Regions:
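Acidic-and-aromatic substrate-binding clefts and catalytic sites of carbohydrate-active enzymes
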Residues: 25-28, 46-56, 78-85, 111-114, ...
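N-terminal binding-site loop/beta-alpha segment at the start of enzyme catalytic domains
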Residues: 1-71, 122, 189-190, 256, ...
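Alpha-helical scaffolding within the catalytic cores
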Residues: 2-7, 55, 59-62, 88-91, ...
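Short, acidic/polar
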Residues: 25-38, 81-97, 143-146, 167-168
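A short, structured active-site edge motif that brings together acidic residues
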Residues: 68-81, 103-109, 163
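CE4/NodB-like, metal-dependent polysaccharide N-deacetylase domain
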Residues: 85-106, 125-129, 150-151
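Residues at the N-termini of beta-strands
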Residues: 44, 100-103, 134, 158
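Beta/alpha (TIM)-barrel catalytic core signal, keyed to glycine-rich beta->alpha loops juxtaposed to Asp/Glu
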Residues: 109-275
Length: 275
């Protein structure tokens, strides 16, 4: 089996291309999930203040037999804390029992309140202090990103967005790439594969490679140059989602999956959410 791939970010830091997402997992569930994930080979864990499970993540990491330097931990600044990023980060660090965060993301731009530039400036300072290795955003549209860059001169290293075969966001993905912003996919399986896993192209590729539909979709993300964080608390699925390093999709196969794009957003609209 090939080794799990890593991505070099524009700030020089490196992150695993495949990680474990823990949205909707309780503190208890997340401990077991992370233990399993680390055993399987995951080294990247994606949580958020809004998930209310940072304490569980912290306990799991405290008990882990993996060195901190080998781990890549992401958490996120919630919408209510755009004017107090320092306090929010310190609270997250305390719950996670960590001295620093590998990647701190602003969870949503919340343009109705319009404090996201102020929040970004605060995150820049926290990075300078060494409390954060890398800083990025989630759910930012092109105009939000351009404003951050114009007003601060600092470009996010990551833009984590809803991205799956039904919602491929190719224009935003391309814009991110042009500006050396790595695109990261949340809800990469389209909320459990609804409308994706039953597609003929996905089923045919699963048969061809002896893989599950979920593994085909995860491989599609990887071969499209995306960072991907499928969420699960089920041990068998956590292992299944990581067993994707022994095959690759070719250009024609990626092209067939590209045809599934419907622009179908399953989550909130970033221009409307919050506020």
């Amino acid at each position: 089996m090939a080794n799990p791939t890593v991505i070099k970010l524009q700030d020089g830091n490196v992150m695993p291309q495949l990680g474990l997402g823990v949205w909707q997992a309780s503190n208890e569930e997340v401990i077991t999930a992370i233990q399993k994930a680390l055993d399987v080979g995951y080294r990247s864990i994606d949580t958020a203040a809004a998930y209310k499970n940072e304490e569980g993540v912290g306990k799991a990491l405290k008990n882990a037999s993996v060195n901190r330097e080998e781990l890549f931990i992401t958490t996120k600044l919630w919408n209510d804390d755009h004017k107090r990023p320092r306090e929010a980060l310190l609270d997250s660090l305390k719950k996670l029992q960590l001295d620093y965060i590998d990647l701190y993301l602003m969870h949503w731009p919340v343009p109705a309140i319009d404090h996201y530039v102020e929040a970004w400036k605060g995150m820049i300072e926290l990075q300078k202090e060494g409390l954060i290795k890398s800083i990025g955003v989630c759910n930012f549209q092109i105009h939000h990103l351009q404003r951050l860059i114009d007003e601060t001169g600092v470009t996010p290293v990551i833009n984590q967005i809803e991205l799956h075969p039904l919602m491929q966001q190719r224009q935003l993905h391309a814009w991110n790439a042009t500006h050396k912003i790595q695109t990261e996919s949340w809800s990469p399986l389209a909320q459990g594969g609804k409308g994706v896993f039953d597609q003929k192209v996905i089923r045919d590729l699963a048969d061809k490679y002896g893989k599950t539909p979920a593994q085909i979709v995860i491989r599609w993300h990887l071969d499209s140059g995306l960072v991907v964080i499928p969420k699960s608390v089920t041990p068998s699925r956590i292992a299944e989602n990581f067993d994707v390093w022994d095959f690759r999709l070719d250009k024609d196969e990626l092209g067939e999956i590209a045809k599934l794009d419907q622009g179908k957003r399953l989550g909130p609209d970033p221009d409307q959410f919050g506020g």
